[in-house]
């Protein structure tokens, strides 16, 4: 399992997984897998991480590095 800070960042912004999916264009299943640790967000495609960072109004570094 891979630890990601994506869930805490999403919750800080007050977004559900579904809302983040719609806002970022990243499939809901991918977001769930990153948050649950089934997929390593550090191995995600660059465009995916960029979309998530833009949707969360944060730096890419904030997403790929655990807190």
Identify the function of each model-found stretch.
Residues 1-14:
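A short, Lys/Arg-rich alpha-helix, primarily the initiator
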Residues 10, 21, 53:
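The alpha-helix within a helix-turn-helix
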Residues 6, 20, 31-34, 63:
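Conserved hydrophobic/aromatic packing and binding residues within compact polymer-binding modules
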Residues 38-51:
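Short, basic-rich loop-to-helix N-cap that marks the start of a DNA-contacting helix
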Residues 26-41:
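Recognition helix of helix-turn-helix/homeodomain-like DNA-binding domains
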Residues 16, 27-30, 45, 59:
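Short coil turns linking two alpha-helices in DNA-binding domains
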Residues 56-67:
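Short C-terminal boundary/hinge segments that cap the last helix of small helical domains
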